[in-house]
């Protein structure tokens, strides 16, 4: 399945099971369907494809609860699309709601991640920022925001579009490799 609306994927495996596809099929019966995430039983395990990292949180928590230390979770990976021989990357829109006292710290984090600020609204009690960035620059942003705001900041991330990449992920053009795509 392509699922180009899901630019993020994460693989779950069971350390004690030599047949990962069986584990994946079993898990798929436990997980609730959602418009934010798709599941696929693959030879390597359960492939979870999602709109963002937050969509992965609930199924990951359930899997950890059920399987404990036997669960192996690979880090989330950005899903690049390929059109012809050219890789395209997902561009995400980001909305952040914070207390004004955290504004400078959050804008500093934006600068470190090369996040482009699109709009800013500040009132005495709340500051709302709208921005965009490649998904690869936003991985782990929720945790970073929580640290910057003592857990009070809110954020929403969603897919806006795919754009051609001038520098393929992992320097794959130089190595003669094709970027992983949403069609894989």
Residue ranges, per PLM feature:
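Accessory interaction regions appended to the cores of large information-processing enzymes
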Residues: 1-184
């Amino acid at each position: 399945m392509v699922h180009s609306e899901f630019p993020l994927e994460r693989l779950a495996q069971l350390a004690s099971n030599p047949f990962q596809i069986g584990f994946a099929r079993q898990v798929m019966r436990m997980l609730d369907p959602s418009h934010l995430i798709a599941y696929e039983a693959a030879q390597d395990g359960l492939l979870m494809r999602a709109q963002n990292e937050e969509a992965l949180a609930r199924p990951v928590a359930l899997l950890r609860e059920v399987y404990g230390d036997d669960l192996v979770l690979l880090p989330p990976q950005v899903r690049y699309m390929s059109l012809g021989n050219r890789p395209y990357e997902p561009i995400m829109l980001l909305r952040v709601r914070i207390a004004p006292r955290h504004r400078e710290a959050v804008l500093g984090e934006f600068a470190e991640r090369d996040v482009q600020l699109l709009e800013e609204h500040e009132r005495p009690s709340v500051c709302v920022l709208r921005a965009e960035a490649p998904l690869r620059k936003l991985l782990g942003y929720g945790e970073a925001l929580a640290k910057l705001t003592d857990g009070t900041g809110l954020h929403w991330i969603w897919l806006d579009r795919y754009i051609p990449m001038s520098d393929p992920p992992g320097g794959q053009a130089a190595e003669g490799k094709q970027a992983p795509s949403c069609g894989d």
